[in-house]
């Protein structure tokens, strides 16, 4: 073994070694258990980030662990087309580089550009998965829009449509005016911003309140720009101020249109004046009131967020209504929302319709992709009825067919599923799965995989024009069937028959609603077992927290705190890191901010740490916390561990070389310190297996780190140095055997976590022993417990000696004596048994603690201060030069 440890060289060699030797393509054995994980498909939107490295490290650990146990194993990789994200990013790119938008390209050419970009992006993603060491055959990688996935998506849609679980209806939804598509409630980010509350006079219609001195009502609103969509003014039925006004009419400002005054419990008497304008086309609460009171709905906005020329009017069921009375002043038509607001406020002020305004904090929905304010909009969308599907999915978790890890996330799942709404599955995008519905000129719907399929099934001749639905499916639709679609369904597939349901899915808690719940619902509805019962998609759900930076802040490009795992693995200069973080950012202020943050955190760039250190650090933080802070210092600590493992392995291999060592356990005459370390090993092996089987990788890392560094290296290796240095013949064979046994089995336990370095060490170690050793760790049988421990007091004896040595080291530190300086030690007032233990292990104490002479005394000498004495297990110790 060469010095020093070179992670780059080792990692590049072994991934090619696994690939060349077809280790990803293990033959199936029907006598073995099956273990499968579907890799959560990363979006094709760009480079993988630390969050991906976190999940993929965890996944690969379980895959390698089960491979070494002899199970049939599959890690099915894939990539998600990420409809809205991909389209949004590519639109920004073509605008940034070409000053064009997608309409300049047209749908067909724009989609071609995305496919080109997808090919480049896929190469990068595969490279990153390889670099991390994931044990998967990337020649078999799937894509959520490949031909087989399209077949699966169409099959599922048509099955749900046939079973009347899919329908199309006009509903009020969040609309992204920038992306020009409907957005799910789960894809919004509510932000508090500074706003205003205007108090506007709404005058009574002629003869509506002629017997009263009151000629107007004061209406408080944060959205004066939507007054042309008003259909009523509402007051609380308990508000005595307005009881006599119910049923009267009032005029919409700047128009001659009259609207009724109604009463509704929703209105808060202490909000503003206690009178609220009802604008159901642009407010969700108003939409509910409209339904209850059977009012019309007016839409005053275009899909691009401009004030329209001619408002669209619908009844409370969403049917079109002709109403020529509803008009918008010409000078407002075509204005943006903010322009219209300013213009309308100006007009109202001129007419003295605004009595006052207040500054007010308002919470508004923003699109998490576009970053723009979303508008409530009445649109015609496709939905899945989820109530029936959710009931079966809830029972699967309640009956423990599916287990959440940790259990706390079950409540989150139940809370969502028990109050689930129908799922809006259509998006007004170009990139995605086109909905497999065709229309004739009369807007009749025809479901089918293709136009020819529709014509054949419904006997429609070629002269009749058929047009496919323009909308695409929500990205989460194809993701929801990924557990079975990625394994080859709907075709007959050995892969599907062998590995479905899968064993484990790994997901962040933030997509339990988006992904996990929907996978369970659709899988259990579509896939049935041989008895016709619903089949679950996976048996265990490992929920992780979200990776944040070391300060607990969410990582984002605009914050300048995103870390590419490849940069941690290979290293990157400060200059290149700044270039990478500011690429495609045109805002000068933001660029300077990112530069400042980067220089402060990484003044010398990022050093290379290697994939193994990254994997080990990711496993060490794989707990159930919702927020997981990642700090490079932690990764440095695990790189140091890899260095330690390398150096101790080198020491063992050098000292075992050319020595005739017996590897037959029955021929080994264990010394008490051999017995002690093997006892420690057995305990570690037990805890390792228990915790990895219970998904506690963080505890496994702690156990292995503590054992290898602080027990094996700090104590047993130090003792073995004495044996080799002094050539103690009687101890050589059992010491060599013990060193080999511990290193061999530690490498096996470590391999799922740090596969590259363990392979290199194994390659060197296996040259020294019997031919049945494989040339790769992963093909070896899983570690075993040591079965020939001596049943005596040797373990406790060595623990006592360890404590004594620790005391001597502490005394040296307190006296500012160098750790390797020889000192004399005095033990005071010991029992006969304690004295025997010390004398029996005097050489260990002398060599490890750097002790020259050992004395025993019945009392503390007068010249020794109490502070200079340490007491351990009733043994008093002091040192002197």
UniProtKB/Swiss-Prot annotation:
EC number(s) given by UniProt: 6.1.1.9
Protein name: Valine--tRNA ligase
Keyword terms: Aminoacyl-tRNA synthetase, ATP-binding, Cytoplasm, Ligase, Nucleotide-binding, Protein biosynthesis
Binding site for ATP: 557
Pfam families for this protein: Anticodon_1, tRNA-synt_1
Main subcellular location of this protein, as a coarse class: cytoplasm
UniProt similarity note: Belongs to the class-I aminoacyl-tRNA synthetase family. ValS type 1 subfamily.
Motif mapping: 'HIGH' region: 42-52
Alphabetized NCBIfam families for the sequence: PRK05729.1 (NF004349), valS (TIGR00422)
A Gene Ontology cellular-component term: cytosol
Record-annotated membrane-spanning stretches: none
Leading EC class: ligase
Molecular functions per Gene Ontology: aminoacyl-tRNA deacylase activity; ATP binding; valine-tRNA ligase activity
Subunit structure: Monomer.
Organism of origin: Wigglesworthia glossinidia brevipalpis
UniProt keyword Cytoplasm, yes or no: yes
Compartment(s) where it occurs, according to its Swiss-Prot or TrEMBL record: Cytoplasm
Described purpose of this protein according to its UniProt entry: Catalyzes the attachment of valine to tRNA(Val). As ValRS can inadvertently accommodate and process structurally similar amino acids such as threonine, to avoid such errors, it has a 'posttransfer' editing activity that hydrolyzes mischarged Thr-tRNA(Val) in a tRNA-dependent manner.
SUPFAM superfamilies: Anticodon-binding domain of a subclass of class I aminoacyl-tRNA synthetases, Nucleotidylyl transferase, ValRS/IleRS/LeuRS editing domain
Highest taxon of source: Bacteria
Comment text on domains: ValRS has two distinct active sites: one for aminoacylation and one for editing. The misactivated threonine is translocated from the active site to the editing site.
Locus of motif 'KMSKS' region: 554-558
Catalytic activity: tRNA(Val) + L-valine + ATP = L-valyl-tRNA(Val) + AMP + diphosphate
Gene: valS
Gene3D superfamilies associated with the record: HUPs (3.40.50.620), Isoleucyl-tRNA Synthetase, Domain 1 (1.10.730.10), Valyl/Leucyl/Isoleucyl-tRNA synthetase, editing domain (3.90.740.10)
Gene Ontology biological process terms in this record: valyl-tRNA aminoacylation
């Amino acid at each position: 073994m060469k010095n020093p440890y070179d992670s780059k060289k080792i990692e590049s060699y072994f991934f090619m070694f696994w690939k060349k030797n077809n280790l990803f393509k293990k033959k199936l054995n029907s006598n073995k258990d099956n273990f499968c994980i579907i890799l959560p498909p990363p979006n094709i939107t760009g480079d993988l980030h630390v969050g991906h490295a976190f999940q993929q490290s965890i996944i690969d650990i379980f895959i390698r662990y089960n491979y070494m146990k002899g199970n049939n194993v599959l890690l099915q990789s894939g990539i998600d087309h990420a409809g809205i994200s991909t389209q949004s990013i590519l639109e920004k790119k073509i605008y940034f580089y070409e000053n064009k938008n997608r309409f300049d390209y047209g749908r067909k050419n724009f989609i071609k550009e995305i496919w080109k970009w997808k090919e480049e992006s896929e190469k990068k993603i595969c490279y990153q998965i390889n670099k991390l060491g994931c044990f998967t055959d990337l020649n078999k990688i799937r894509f959520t829009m490949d031909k087989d996935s399209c077949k699966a998506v169409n099959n599922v849609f048509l099955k749900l449509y046939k079973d009347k679980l899919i329908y199309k209806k006009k509903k009020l939804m969040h609309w992204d005016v920038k992306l020009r598509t409907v957005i799910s409630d789960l894809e919004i980010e509510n932000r508090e911003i500074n706003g205003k509350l205007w108090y506007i006079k709404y005058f009574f219609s002629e003869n509506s309140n002629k017997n009263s001195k009151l000629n107007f009502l004061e209406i408080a609103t944060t959205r004066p720009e939507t007054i042309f969509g008003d259909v009523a003014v509402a007051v609380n039925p308990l508000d005595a101020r307005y009881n006599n006004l119910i049923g009267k009419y009032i005029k919409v400002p700047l128009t001659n249109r009259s609207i009724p005054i109604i009463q509704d419990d929703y209105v808060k008497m202490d909000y503003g004046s206690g009178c609220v304008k009802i604008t159901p086309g642009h407010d969700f609460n108003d939409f509910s009131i409209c339904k209850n009171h059977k009012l019309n709905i007016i839409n005053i906005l275009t899909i691009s967020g401009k004030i329209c020329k001619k408002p669209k009017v619908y009844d409370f069921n969403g049917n079109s209504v002709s109403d020529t009375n509803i008009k918008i002043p010409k000078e407002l038509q075509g204005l943006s929302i903010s322009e219209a607001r300013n213009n309308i406020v100006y007009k109202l002020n001129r007419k003295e319709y605004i009595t006052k305004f207040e500054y007010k904090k308002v919470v508004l929905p923003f699109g998490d992709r576009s970053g723009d304010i979303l508008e409530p909009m009445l649109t015609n969308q496709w939905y899945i009825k989820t109530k029936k599907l959710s009931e079966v999915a809830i029972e699967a978790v309640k009956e423990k067919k599916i287990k959440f890890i940790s259990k706390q996330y079950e409540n989150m799942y139940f809370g969502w599923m028990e109050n689930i709404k129908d799922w809006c599955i259509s998006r007004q995008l170009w990139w995605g799965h086109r909905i497999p519905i065709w229309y004739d000129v009369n807007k009749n719907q025809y479901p089918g995989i293709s136009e020819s399929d529709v014509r054949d099934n419904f006997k429609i001749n070629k002269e009749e024009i058929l047009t496919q639905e323009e909308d695409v499916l929500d990205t989460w639709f194809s993701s929801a069937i990924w557990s079975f679609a990625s394994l080859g369904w709907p075709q007959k597939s050995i892969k599907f028959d062998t590995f479905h349901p899968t064993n484990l899915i790994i997901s962040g808690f933030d997509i339990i609603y988006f992904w996990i719940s929907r996978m369970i619902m659709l899988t259990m509805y579509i896939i049935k077992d041989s008895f016709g019962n619903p089949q679950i998609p996976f048996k265990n759900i490992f929920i992780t927290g979200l990776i944040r930076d070391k300060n607990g802040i969410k990582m984002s490009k605009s914050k300048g705190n995103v870390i590419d795992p490849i940069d941690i693995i290979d290293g990157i200069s400060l200059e290149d890191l700044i270039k990478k973080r500011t690429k495609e950012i045109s805002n000068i202020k933001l660029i300077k901010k990112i530069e400042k943050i980067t220089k402060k955190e990484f003044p010398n760039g990022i050093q290379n740490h290697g994939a193994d250190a990254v994997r080990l650090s990711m496993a060490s933080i794989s707990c159930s916390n919702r927020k997981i802070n990642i700090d490079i210092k932690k990764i440095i600590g695990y790189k140091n561990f890899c260095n330690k493992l390398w150096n101790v392995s080198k020491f063992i291999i050098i000292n075992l070389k050319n020595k005739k060592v017996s590897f037959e356990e029955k021929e080994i005459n264990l010394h008490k310190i051999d017995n002690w370390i093997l006892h420690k090993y057995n305990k570690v092996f037990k805890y390792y297996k228990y915790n990895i089987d219970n998904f506690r990788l963080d505890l496994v890392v702690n156990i292995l780190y503590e054992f290898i560094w602080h027990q094996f290296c700090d104590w047993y290796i130090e003792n073995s140095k004495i044996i080799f240095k002094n050539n103690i013949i009687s101890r050589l064979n059992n010491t060599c055997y013990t060193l080999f046994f511990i290193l061999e089995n530690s490498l096996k336990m470590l391999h799922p976590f740090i596969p590259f370095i363990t392979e290199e060490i194994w390659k060197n170690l296996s040259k020294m022993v019997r031919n049945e050793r494989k040339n790769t760790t992963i093909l070896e049988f899983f570690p075993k417990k040591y079965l020939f421990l001596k049943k005596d007091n040797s373990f406790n004896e060595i623990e006592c000696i360890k404590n004594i040595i620790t005391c001597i080291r502490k005394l040296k530190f307190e006296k500012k004596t160098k750790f390797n300086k020889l000192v004399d030690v005095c033990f005071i007032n010991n029992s006969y048994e304690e004295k025997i233990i010390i004398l029996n292990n005097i050489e260990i104490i002398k060599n490890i603690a750097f002790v020259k002479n050992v004395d025993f005394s019945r009392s503390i000498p007068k010249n020794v201060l109490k502070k200079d004495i340490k007491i351990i297990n009733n043994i008093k110790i002091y040192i002197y030069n």
